[in-house]
C-alpha cells in the first residue's frame, strides 16, 4: 500500500492474524479510542472480515487527526469463538495497543495473536 499524501488527510488501518492457526482472524471486534490527556473517547467499533481486515479504514480523510490513539482487540472473545479452550480468566482477553500518529500519512497497526502471546508493529 502506498502512503497517503498529507493532502489526503492520512488514514489508519489494521488487520489481525491468528498465529496459532496461521489464518486471518475473521470476526474479531476492534474498538478505536482517541486519547487526550486522561480522557479516552470511543470513536467506533468494527469487526474484521474473512481476510482479517476491516472493510474500510478506521480513520481517513477529514476524520483523521494527529494524536494518541488506542485500539482494543477482543482477542479472548475471538479465540473462544474459534473453540480455543482458555483458562478463566484468560491470559489474553482484551489486547490494547496505544500509539501516536504525528502526521497525515498512512498508519497500519497489525496484530498477530495466539492464546498466550501477541505482537504488533507499524506496517505499511
Swiss-Prot record:
UniProt-annotated binding residues for substrate: 15, 53, 121
Catalysed reactions, semicolon-separated: 5-hydroxyisourate + H2O = 5-hydroxy-2-oxo-4-ureido-2,5-dihydro-1H-imidazole-5-carboxylate + H(+)
Q: What does this protein do?
A: Catalyzes the hydrolysis of 5-hydroxyisourate (HIU) to 2-oxo-4-hydroxy-4-carboxy-5-ureidoimidazoline (OHCU).
User: Which domain of life does the UniProt lineage start with?
Assistant: Bacteria
Supply any other comment: HIU hydrolysis also occurs spontaneously, but more slowly.
Q: What is its EC number?
A: 3.5.2.17
Q: Name one GO molecular function term.
A: hydroxyisourate hydrolase activity
**UniProt-listed CDD domains:** TLP_HIUase (cd05822)
What is this protein's name? Answer: 5-hydroxyisourate hydrolase
Q: What's the subunit arrangement here? A: Homotetramer.
| Sequence similarity | Belongs to the transthyretin family. 5-hydroxyisourate hydrolase subfamily.
Query: What keywords is this UniProt entry annotated with?
Result: Hydrolase, Purine metabolism
Gene3D superfamilies the record matches: Transthyretin/hydroxyisourate hydrolase domain
Mind telling me which Pfam families this protein's record contains?
Transthyretin
Q: In Gene Ontology terms, what is a biological process of this protein?
A: purine nucleobase metabolic process
Organism field: Mesorhizobium japonicum (strain LMG 29417 / CECT 9101 / MAFF 303099)
Amino acid at each position: 500500500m502506498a502512503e497517503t499524501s498529507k493532502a489526503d488527510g492520512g488514514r489508519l488501518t489494521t488487520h489481525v492474524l491468528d498465529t496459532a492457526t496461521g489464518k486471518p482472524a475473521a470476526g474479531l471486534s476492534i474498538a478505536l479510542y482517541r486519547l487526550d490527556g486522561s480522557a479516552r473517547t470511543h470513536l467506533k467499533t468494527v469487526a474484521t472480515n474473512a481476510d482479517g481486515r476491516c472493510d474500510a479504514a478506521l480513520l481517513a480523510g477529514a476524520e483523521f487527526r494527529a494524536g494518541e490513539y488506542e485500539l482494543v482487540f477482543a482477542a479472548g472473545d475471538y479465540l473462544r469463538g474459534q473453540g480455543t479452550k482458555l483458562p478463566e480468566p484468560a491470559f489474553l482477553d482484551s489486547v490494547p495497543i496505544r500509539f501516536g500518529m504525528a502526521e497525515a500519512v498512512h498508519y497500519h497497526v497489525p496484530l498477530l495473536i495466539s492464546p498466550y502471546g501477541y505482537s504488533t508493529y507499524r506496517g505499511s
